[in-house]
A protein has these predicted regions:
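Boundary regions of SH3-family modules and the immediately adjacent low-complexity/disordered segments
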Residues: 1-10, 17-18, 22-34, 39-65
Length: 65
């Protein structure tokens, strides 16, 4: 799978595909993840650090070189 990293200082990880959904965690600048699926403006990610899964705005993710 392709690896992605967070390109902003901090971004919420949400339980559902919505800005109004509960924030269950955060992804910090430079932390890496895999994209499991994409829906609209959001991507469901799995964090490399701890395996945590949730939804983030796709615009904060950049593909690793």
């Amino acid at each position: 799978m392709e690896k992605y990293y967070c390109s902003v200082s901090v971004s919420p990880i949400r339980a559902e595909v919505s800005e109004k959904s509960e924030m269950t965690s955060q992804i910090l600048y430079g932390e890496t993840c895999e994209i499991i699926e994409t829906e609209g403006l959001y991507s469901k990610i799995k964090m490399d650090f701890d395996g945590y899964e949730g939804w983030v705005n796709s615009s904060v993710l950049k593909k690793e070189n």
